[in-house]
């Protein structure tokens, strides 16, 4: 069995190399064509439909060789080899280093702060030690009751 995947429409065709007239096509040990066919080719359809499996063509002598088909269809895949992985690791180390340097320099700056209202202290006049309490209402809980 040979594979022809150089079709314009992207289809995958299997070619049975035999001199026999009657051929049976099998996929994963299951019959996919009748034994009376004389087609030496079998169309698996488009390669994007992922035509995986073990294919065989058997003649009347029941001798065949199998062919395993496996298409790896990946649109956005990256080939991971040693150089790619080393590039990822190097880029990660450099970015962490630059981030650490940036945080160090920004955190180490002593900039001029704007004073806020909460930073100002209210000073007591005339050097008083204590500030007198403000007037308050006497409610029912401010006095003890006599029984």
UniProtKB/Swiss-Prot annotation:
SUPFAM superfamilies: Immunoglobulin. GO terms for cellular component: alpha-beta T cell receptor complex; external side of plasma membrane. The modification Phosphoserine is found at residues 115, 118. Keywords: Adaptive immunity, Cell membrane, Disulfide bond, Glycoprotein, Immunity, Immunoglobulin domain, Membrane, Phosphoprotein, Receptor, Transmembrane, Transmembrane helix. The chain crosses the membrane at residues 86-106. GO terms for biological process: adaptive immune response; cell surface receptor signaling pathway; establishment or maintenance of cell polarity; positive thymic T cell selection; protein transport; regulation of lymphocyte apoptotic process. Gene3D superfamilies: Immunoglobulins. This is T-cell surface glycoprotein CD3 gamma chain. The TCR-CD3 complex is composed of a CD3D/CD3E and a CD3G/CD3E heterodimers that preferentially associate with TCRalpha and TCRbeta, respectively, to form TCRalpha/CD3E/CD3G and TCRbeta/CD3G/CD3E trimers. In turn, the hexamer interacts with CD3Z homodimer to form the TCR-CD3 complex. Alternatively, TCRalpha and TCRbeta can be replaced by TCRgamma and TCRdelta.
